[in-house]
Amino acid sequence: MLRASLILAVAALAVAGAASARTTAFPITIQAANGDVVISKQPTRIVSLSPTTTEDLFAVGAGKQVVAVDEDSDYPKSAPRTKLSGLSPNAEAIAQFRPDLVVLSYPGPVIAQLEKLGITVLEEPAVDTIAQAYQEIRELGAATGHGAGAAKVVRGMEVKLTKLIRSVPKKHRHLRVYHELTPDYYTATSATFIGRVYKLFGFRNVADAADATHSGYPQLSGEYLLSANPQLVVLADSVCCGQSAKTVQARAGWQQLDAVKRHRVVAVDDSVASRWGPRLVDFVAAVAAAARRV
């Protein structure tokens, strides 16, 4: 019942997306995290200081308007990557690119500093839900003159995610899942964005009962994991830390885990697993493929 309701919620967002399909007319006001942001005309020199917003901008069709992205924006490869920091942005360094729009994910004094220089700033923070991720894509589409492109991206994600979720057999909808962030067992609970993605499938997160501080990102012990016996293991530390199904099998006691015995250990690209843009579909596809294994 829960999974069916969640699938319907994902599909229902298509109705909201239809309103964004029109070509953006300027000036336009975007209700962003930093308030109502007025964009007087279509931006032609955009600086993106967030890997996710960079992916969103290129996906909606605004790639040619982007003149610089931060050092962590590694996708798409055609993005103009620089040494700009998205975590500790410097207004003077950003201003050197003569932007008419700066998009970032973290609040801070740099917003006021850039606005003082006459530069429009749009804050699109980390999201908690897929609905919020869709909304950010729509906002970036509207802000850049690509409302129709954004609507197409969102609709494509909705359709693909619904299909992938439904591809997992009913008998696997309650699998116990462990999402690994680091080899020393830092993980994410159902209270996080990625945890809510697992809930779309109906999976049970083994970390939920161990998050005493309610941080959303507890560190588990090896003993706890062996006792929890996850049936699906997702390794989001494959790039940073070289983790794979092979390295997991070499861990003491892990050969007895259901996930290992059933070959339901999947290594995913760290960056794909940590972002909330269009490549979320790739992450869900990898998880669904592993969950379908008998």
Please describe what each predicted stretch is.
Residues L2-A4, A9, V15-T52, A148-H179, ...:
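Bacterial Sec-exported substrate-binding components of ABC uptake systems
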Residues P89-P99, K116-L117, P218-N229:
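Short helices/loops that flank or line small-molecule/ion binding pockets
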